[in-house]
Amino acid sequence: MTVQLSPSVAQPQMVGTTITWTATASDTNSGTLDFQFSVELATNGFQVLQDYDVSNVFSWTPYAQEGKYQIQVIARNLTTLQTSTLTVPFAIKSRVAGSSPVISATNHPLVALYSAPACPSGSSMYVTFTNGTVSNQTGVNACNGSHSMNFYIGGLYPSTTYTLNYVLVTGSSSTNGPTGQFTTGPIPTGVPFPVMSVLVPAAPQDALTQSILLLDCYSNPVNTNNLDFVPTAVDLNGQVIWYYPGYDSSLNYGSYFIRPVPGGTFLLYPADENTGLRQQLFRQIDMAGNTIRQTSITRINQQLALLGQLPVVGFNHDSEILPNGHTLVKASQEEVFPAGTQGATAPVDILGDCIMDLDKNMQVDWVWSAFTYLNINQKDPLNETCTATSVDCPPLVLAPVANDWTHMNSLNYIPSSGDILVSLRNQDEVLKIDFNNGVGTGDVLWTLGKKGNFTMTGSTDPWPWFSHQHDVNYELNGTSVISLFDNGNTRIYKNPGEVSRGQVLNIDESAFTVSLAMNVNMPGFSPALGSAQRLDNGNYHFEAGWLDYTSSPYGEAIEVLPNGTFGFELIDNSVTYRGYRMDSLYELDAPGN
């Protein structure tokens, strides 16, 4: 077997240029070929950026720094497992020719690339930008003394002129660099945005911080054209300041735009254009929408098979990058069980969940499966099922209908213990799992919920417990406060007419007690979707993702004050998986929140 590798443009190219690599392989043996692409800068070691896939094309946008890179491709015959490896050099040069910064347009009309001269090692740099009314800044990058400093500038209004300058920080002193200007472009026609309406404007008590709202909006399921709205960031007036153009495709209907990552990147689970199936890829993108790294369900399953684990059928709901550079991902698993399981009169297909810890090269390092650690006969209380065509379910491969047993919908890494907090929507439970930074047993350490290990104290509510909850997270960098969106399906099934709630729980893990610090009724019943977040000012943001679900569905972002009253409210004419309030597109929370 031999393999060749060709770039779309000749070297050298400037920082921020997209280079498309095409691999061409030949093999005298029959069999399907797939390809893995890796990149190395200097002698820092290769990092896999696109794991084995039948696609022989790799798009690479080196936006951080110039240097002498090595691009490596491995071609593999899936029948014989024979491989062929080729490594080629490619030079990336700085955009900065002298002592002045350079501001360049990108392929995204609302994102610029700011390039500053190298700065002394031990110092750091960030960029401020303003349109004269609204100001913000990038994250802070460390200087290395020899390479230019490059920043994506995002969170900008369309067709607007901004003034920018870098700030050099050395010890306790800061020095402003020269100013420059950049004018954003217009948003192209045809981009599918939801319509935003502000019900209650932001007031001083709820607009001092986190004045950006990042929304993962699905299309309206009543009048759907199977085309999702693009993930969109707006200000608190509903004006667009960023969007991800990569979702402008019917293939991504029902896919997940997961979460922002500190520094200005984003995690998502898009469809696979090779198969047409949704939720088949894990992808990290930069602010301009370029893919940084990617792997697939197919590649994950190749590794799970070698580990003796069940295959997965689709990524969903959540992912998180860990302090050690690993990434938690989750996916659905499917298994057929004999008659009698969960009360079935015939063999029954059951959907469970799998958590995987991927190392820096996106290789599976640790696996947790609900089928291994949970009681298969603890059936979900509302007898929910998935079909192969349900947009809120993964693709099914074993049967046309499956019991939707667990429906895990959030992951929350716990820095103090290295464990994971997970939400099982269809079980009305929250679990703490022994992860121990990738060497844990996987055992369930405790269960929080109506039938769990904790006693609810101090509440007169006839049904204080959450059900079918979303976005369960510890707050304040600790383990004593949990926020969540209580959809309330089980409670409302038994008490028609009630509504979803925003909840904040005080939890004592040593005494196994929990109390309600906040239990606020939402404007209606959202049977799915939703998020919860403590804001820097002490208020809480709740996203009721699917209100008025039977007629004219919409999502509503609500800021709740500590006394339970509503502040800022914004609605969009979509169903919204999650909503994040952010200081900037580079930072979700202020330190200590």
Regions found by a protein language model. Give the residues of each.
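Short beta-strand segments within Ig-like beta-sandwich modules, predominantly Fibronectin type-III
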Residues: 48-55, 139-146
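A short beta-strand segment in extracellular, disulfide-stabilized domains
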Residues: 17-25, 111-113
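Surface-exposed, short loops/turns at beta-strand junctions within beta-sandwich domains
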Residues: 62-68, 153-161
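Extracellular acidic, Ser/Thr/Pro-rich low-complexity tracts
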Residues: 23-29, 77, 116-121
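Histidine-/acidic-rich catalytic cores in large beta-rich domains
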Residues: 94-113, 118-129, 161, 167-593
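Short, solvent-exposed loop/turn segments at the edges of extracellular beta-sandwich modules
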Residues: 76-82, 169-173
